[in-house]
Amino acid sequence: MCLPTIRKIAIIGAGPSGLVTAKALLAEKAFDQVTLFERRGSPGGVWNYTSTLSNKLPVPSTNPILTTEPIVGPAALPVYPSPLYRDLQTNTPIELMGYCDQSFKPQTLQFPHRHTIQEYQRIYAQPLLPFIKLATDVLDIEKKDGSWVVTYKGTKAGSPISKDIFDAVSICNGHYEVPYIPNIKGLDEYAKAVPGSVLHSSLFREPELFVGESVLVVGGASSANDLVRHLTPVAKHPIYQSLLGGGDIQNESLQQVPEITKFDPTTREIYLKGGKVLSNIDRVIYCTGYLYSVPFPSLAKLKSPETKLIDDGSHVHNVYQHIFYIPDPTLAFVGLALHVVPFPTSQAQAAFLARVWSGRLKLPSKEEQLKWQDELMFSLSGANNMYHSLDYPKDATYINKLHDWCKQATPVLEEEFPSPYWGEKERSIRENMWSIRAKFFGIEPPK
């Protein structure tokens, strides 16, 4: 597939995926303009920790078009909340976590604190600052007369609305903006009856707020297990953890229970699959992930099966290799992949994207791209929320496949932007990552 000549590129988001995409594109030396739009006041995306919380999250939360409202404070610029909590440490060891063109500083912890990653991102962003429009919110992205019209506005009060024209747009806004809380019978009334009794992990900041409270954590992924670890020293025992199919851990501090079937807002009882009932629960914390969101009206209104990007938020539709919009590959995404090591995966995607948009690599035909999508959907057997899931060893295969494609780009540049490759060492660390983490933190690895 041949693409039109691309000279001006917009990147939406200056977080981890947006920054590495900008570096990859600039390294091609093939474009007249590369502009990043970032609504926060500094680059780094969600790694910009905010202690202030938003109080506008609906319960349940199932709308992928939900827009994140800034927190209005005394500062000159509004603050967009981050899902990070105060004591967060990464769930990925530094041997895998970083970009392959920037090492962590010596003596960095194997599983660094959030502020270490924020500083890592700050250093990585430094040479890109002239290309970033900070404190700038993108309102819409629309294809008109063969070009992409990006409508944007400064986040400072009184800023005018502006428009600019681009040949291509890479959406790098991540997938940690719209929390998902499933709609379970009685949940709405239960949450309204006692405000603050139901929250999402994105609103968790510090365990001291849960001292002596009876807590039910919903979910079994890394965020849920991490919150259980932080709550264990302070919360009332046992902490309950609701898992699909239940769980094996039953001890004084933690009891794993089946999924929730109903909330009773009058008695404050929580009914579980199999008949068990929990009572006197002070807080329910949903660690149920996030919805994919494309919060731009002109793109969100695309509804036909051949053109739509979003419907229920389970995944982004019509994207080849989790990157290129099949109907028009001058629109792309970096950072959609789930259950991966984010930085190297985004770097692999960015390296591939840059070589395609510069014309040094060609995409397969539209028919082949659609065939790839159809085969992936068929393999999921209806589990659409796993569309972007690349858990090990899929992520290693994906990263190396993109690396191999990048090696085929012609002509070869004197200084090629690096595409990561995972050899035996990286694969071994990735395969054993959870046991490595459990040993580091002194906890029982998840079953």
Curated annotation (Swiss-Prot):
Residues engaged in binding NADP(+): 90-91, 223-226
Superkingdom, taxonomy of origin: Eukaryota
GO terms classed as biological process: cellular detoxification
Cofactor(s) for this UniProt protein: FAD
Record Pfam families: FMO-like (PF00743), NAD_binding_8 (PF13450)
Binding site for FAD: 13-17, 38, 46-47, 91-92, 137-138
UniProt cross-references to SUPFAM superfamilies, sorted A to Z: FAD/NAD(P)-binding domain
GO cellular component entries: endoplasmic reticulum membrane
Gene3D superfamilies on file: FAD/NAD(P)-binding domain (3.50.50.60)
Molecular-function annotations in GO: FAD binding; N,N-dimethylaniline monooxygenase activity; NADP binding
E.C. number: 1.14.13.-
Keyword terms of this UniProt record: FAD, Flavoprotein, Monooxygenase, NADP, Oxidoreductase
Xref: InterPro entries: FAD/NAD-bd_sf, Flavin_mOase, Flavin_mOase-like, FMO-like
Task of the protein: Flavin-dependent oxidation of thiol-containing compounds. Probably required for the correct folding of disulfide-bonded proteins.
Family per similarity comment: Belongs to the FMO family.
Complexes and interactors: Monomer.
Protein name according to UniProt: Thiol-specific monooxygenase
Native organism taxonomy: Eukaryota, Fungi, Dikarya, Ascomycota, Taphrinomycotina
